Amino acid sequence: MRAEFDESLVTGNEMIDTQHKELIDKINKLLDSCETSKDKVVAVKTLDYLADYTEFHFGEEENLQESISYPAIEEHKREHDKLRKVVKDLYNMLEEEEGPSDAFVEQVNKNVIEWLYRHIKGFDRSVAEYKFMNESSERL
C-alpha cells in the first residue's frame, strides 16, 4: 500500500499541507526501499530519513499550536508521541531481522500510514480550523 495525499487530507493550512505531502513522500520512499532492496542498512537509512523529517514536522506543528494558544496542544503532543513510539518499534524490528520483512512493511502500512491519515483528518484539521477561526474573529 502506498500513501497518497488527496483532498480528504487537506487541512487548509499551506505549511501543514506541504509538510504532510513531504511526509507521505518519505513514507513511500521507505516502502519503495523495502520493495527494491531487502538490505537492512538501506532500510535503516531510509527510516532515519523519515524519522528526522517527522521530528521536524512535529516541531513545526507544535510551534504553530503554541503561537495560536491551541487549547488541545498537550493531547496533540501525546498523539505525536504515539508515532514516535511506532518509529522506535520499527527500528527494533529492523534490529531483530536481516532486513525489512513483510511484517515490517505491514507495520509501516498499519501503524504509520493509517495513523497519519487519522491524525491529519482529526487532530491536524482541528488545529487548522482553530487557527482559521481565530484569524477570522480577529478581523471582525
PLM segments and residue spans:
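Small-residue-biased structural context
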Residues: 1-140
